[in-house]
């Protein structure tokens, strides 16, 4: 898959993802908490607060929420700039409340982390950096300039400067850490979501191709008799019109076109007959079907199929599941792309498992990313090697992820490794020296039960 500027999976395009309703609900929660804190602090704790100014600050949020609720539709999506402005308003309103209520002597100064965390989850990194810098600036301002908290006896509440500095430093570190951490988590979630979408699209495409093949096969079967009739009649006309060359040539053209239609339908429906007998096949045939698009690409593809201890001499008959064929095909494509000359595909079976191994004679996986192979958007081989072996190709790092996801959906376990030490010299490396992928299924997840019915008998009405 190619990452294009207008592609559905373009990860850099994240505008219009957040609904205005979501931020409105969060703001209502903040308003309720602020009102509760102000009332409890003034009425029950006996701290004298400038209630008028405090209620004015909270009222600004209430007015903004009411206007947003009645002016804009509930399903309104926010652009990057609009979301930034809303979060800046909330950050400024909270900082003003801190200015009125003691600055860093107010433990609720910790809430200044909330807008930055939301930005890290929802907005891009530049917006989050801007919001974080403004938050640190406002926090520093309220640390030096604020109205003191006056207790009931008229004394002001103060804390040691060292404690105040420590609280400021803790919040600054929290802004930096939570901003980066929430951003990283959001990227991981979005990457996984995009990759799963790509996987589902690949599986749907494979399923649609299979369904289309079945439709074509049925059409070829239904059109067989009319085409045969056209061919027979045109042949008879050609014989009867032997003395009229012009008309005879027309009859010959009709016969040739009927043959062409037959050949086209036969070739299109060869792989798509939708009967249950064609939904299963020997392990070797299914592997060859998966490898077929990559056999003629200039690399030698060798198959080796054998039973292991306790396995039957005959190849197991397995289901031709689209996710199995497409997943194995992706693994074979990756091996062919990076092999020097040869790809080996081994099939092995026992009484309780089926295993396939795909090995190439390329450079193998970089040791630094072997543990991450199968994660979305990870380039699986060295960049310079990828460009030389796949010129003009700009992948998304989804090939092995799609293969791994599809095969695991079928019940398989995958493992990735290098067949040899990548730091060995050329003459020291064995023939099978590149990347190796092993896929193992339990027998009951893949093998067709012998002597099982192929399907329901069709009721014949007489």
From Swiss-Prot:
Residues 218-445 form the Histidine kinase domain. Its EC number is 2.7.13.3. It is an enzyme of class 2 (transferase). The chain crosses the membrane at residues 26-45, 52-70, 79-96, 104-123, 130-149, 165-182. PROSITE patterns: HIS_KIN. Keywords: ATP-binding, Cell inner membrane, Cell membrane, Kinase, Membrane, Nucleotide-binding, Phosphoprotein, Transferase, Transmembrane, Transmembrane helix, Two-component regulatory system. Residues 46-51, 97-103, 150-164 are extracellular. One of its GO terms (molecular function) is ATP binding. Pfam families: HATPase_c (PF02518), HisKA (PF00512). It is a multi-pass membrane protein. One of its GO terms (cellular component) is plasma membrane. The modification Phosphohistidine is found at residue 221. It catalyses: ATP + protein L-histidine = ADP + protein N-phospho-L-histidine. CDD domains: HisKA. Residues 1-25, 71-78, 124-129, 183-462 are cytoplasmic. SUPFAM superfamilies: ATPase domain of HSP90 chaperone/DNA topoisomerase II/histidine kinase, Homodimeric domain of signal transducing histidine kinase. It is found in: Cell inner membrane. Member of the two-component regulatory system RegB/RegA. Involved in the positive regulation of photosynthesis gene expression in response to anaerobiosis. Also involved in positive regulation of the cbbI and cbbII Calvin cycle CO2 fixation operons, as well as in regulation of expression of genes involved in alternative CO2 fixation pathways. Phosphorylates RegA/PrrA. This is Sensor histidine kinase RegB. The lineage of its organism: Bacteria, Pseudomonadati, Pseudomonadota, Alphaproteobacteria, Rhodobacterales. The gene is regB.
């Amino acid at each position: 898959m190619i990452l294009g500027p207008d592609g559905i999976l373009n990860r850099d395009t994240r505008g219009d993802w957040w609904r205005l309703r979501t931020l409105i609900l969060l703001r209502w929660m903040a308003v309720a908490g602020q009102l509760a804190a102000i009332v409890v602090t003034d009425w029950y704790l006996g701290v004298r607060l400038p209630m008028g100014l405090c209620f004015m600050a909270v009222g600004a949020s209430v007015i903004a929420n009411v206007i947003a609720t009645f002016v804009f539709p509930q399903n309104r999506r926010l652009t990057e700039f609009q979301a930034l402005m809303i979060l800046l308003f909330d950050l400024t309103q909270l900082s003003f409340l801190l200015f009125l209520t003691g600055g860093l002597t107010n433990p609720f100064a910790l809430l200044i982390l909330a807008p930055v965390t939301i930005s890290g989850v929802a907005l891009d990194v530049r917006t989050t950096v801007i919001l974080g810098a403004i938050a640190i600036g406002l926090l520093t301002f309220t640390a030096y300039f604020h109205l003191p908290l006056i207790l009931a006896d008229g004394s002001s509440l103060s804390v040691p400067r060292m404690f105040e500095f420590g609280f400021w430093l803790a919040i600054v570190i929290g802004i930096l850490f939570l901003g980066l951490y929430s951003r990283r988590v959001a990227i991981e979630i979005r990457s996984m979501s995009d990759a799963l979408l790509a996987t589902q699209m690949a599986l749907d495409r494979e399923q649609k191709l299979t369904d289309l093949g079945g439709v074509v096969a049925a059409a070829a079967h239904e059109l067989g008799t009319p085409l045969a009739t056209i061919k027979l009649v045109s042949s008879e006309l050609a014989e009867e019109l032997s003395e009229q060359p012009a008309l005879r040539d027309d009859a010959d053209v009709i016969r040739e076109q009927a043959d062409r239609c037959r050949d086209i339908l036969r070739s299109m429906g060869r792989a798509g007959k939708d009967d249950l007998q064609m939904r299963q096949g020997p392990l070797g045939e299914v592997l060859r079907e998966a490898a077929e698009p990559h056999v003629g690409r200039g690399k030698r593809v060798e198959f080796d199929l054998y039973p292991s201890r306790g396995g039957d001499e005959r190849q197991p008959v397995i289901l031709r599941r689209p996710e199995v064929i497409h997943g194995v095909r992706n693994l074979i494509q990756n091996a062919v792309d990076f092999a020097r000359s040869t790809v080996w595909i081994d099939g092995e079976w026992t009484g309780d498992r089926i295993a396939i191994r795909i090995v190439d004679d390329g450079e193998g996986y970089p040791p630094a990313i072997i543990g991450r192979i199968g994660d979305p958007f990870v380039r699986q081989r060295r960049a310079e090697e990828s460009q030389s072996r796949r010129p003009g190709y700009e992948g998304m790092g989804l090939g092995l992820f799609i293969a791994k996801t599809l095969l695991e959906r079928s019940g398989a376990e995958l493992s990735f490794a290098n067949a040899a030490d990548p730091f060995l010299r050329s003459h020291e490396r064995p023939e099978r020296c590149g990347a190796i992928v092993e896929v193992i299924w339990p027998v009951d997840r893949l093998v067709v039960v012998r002597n099982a019915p192929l399907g329901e008998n069709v009721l014949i009405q007489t």
